[in-house]
Amino acid sequence: PGPPVVSGAGVDACRVRRGSIDIGKDGLDTSGADYTRLISQASQLQGGIWAKKLDVTVGNNDVAANGAVTATEASKGQPLQWGIDVGQLGGMYAGKITLISTDKGVGVNNAGQIFASAGGVSIDANGQLTNSGSLIVSDKEAQQADQAKVTIKATDVTNSGTLSSQGKAQLQTRNLSNSGLIASSNELNLRNQSHLRNSGDISAKRLDIQTGSLDNQQGVISQTGSQKLTLSAGTLSNLNKGVIGALPEGTSSNQGSQTGGQSGQTAQHTPSTAAGGGNVALTTNPSTPVVLADGHIEVSKQLTNDAGQIIANGEVNLSATDGLSNHGQMTLGSLQVRGKQFDNDQGELNLSRLDSETDRFSKRAGQLNDRTTTDIRTQ
């Protein structure tokens, strides 16, 4: 990979400027060691790797003896697409997994399995993260959410597989596209700078989401805890019988149970779920109930819910600062609307409190329940 940096005390660092570490179909079992570090410019896994603690660091880096990246250098020539590439038959199985890709625009691709049993998974990529496989953290012995969590930082995230945590899940990205499952048995903290597109399932006991825009087309965004959920948006459009708030009686969401890997799996054994395939329900310790704060979804610009569901078990309170168009169903505690237009044509509103101040209010063939305390003002 590169020349070592040596002092009188031994090897101080490794200077990586080229080279790839590839794991073939026979895999690599290092579970007998206390920790395993792969340090190279790139790494490809076509088989499994087993470890107690696994660190994979790729890019043109100076890496200290303790595994810390002390310096980086821009790549010369054509950059790689993936710094870490896990194939369909590849996988990582460990107590704790840390993946770092430092080269600009060079990301992480997982089509296989990434499974951590206790210490969680941390991914820091200076490029895109693509997950079409399974990325799961599950530990039935964990007593705190921080002991079994997923932490992801990437420029863009595309998920068509399973991304699931028994503890907290934290995602920091510029754009997020989800057609698979993103789930947490605790809290999902999502900071998305620009556009969030969801046609899959986003589910957590507590939702804490901030994004520039949200397009929920036939997707499900659900808060499974009993606490309240506050939803705020610039402009909101609820289309094609979309549902926001509590589900109508006698119906169910498209979501299944929150999912994850098989609790109790050790790092030395491969989970039985196929890569990118079936899911196993996560369990939490019933003797230590978790009390979480109210959830929050903040969309600074446009929120479009097209035949989708944004739902919670507790009361949902909604505010729109730049107009609202509802052609579906909303079941809310309170609704506050400001802006040019409030359009409830052919829509259904089930509310306790309505506070609307817009230039125009329209409800042709729309429904507003008679138990609502209303304050509607137009200019």
Per-region residue spans from a language model:
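Extracellular and secretory-pathway beta-repeat/beta-biased strand scaffolds
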Residues: 1-379
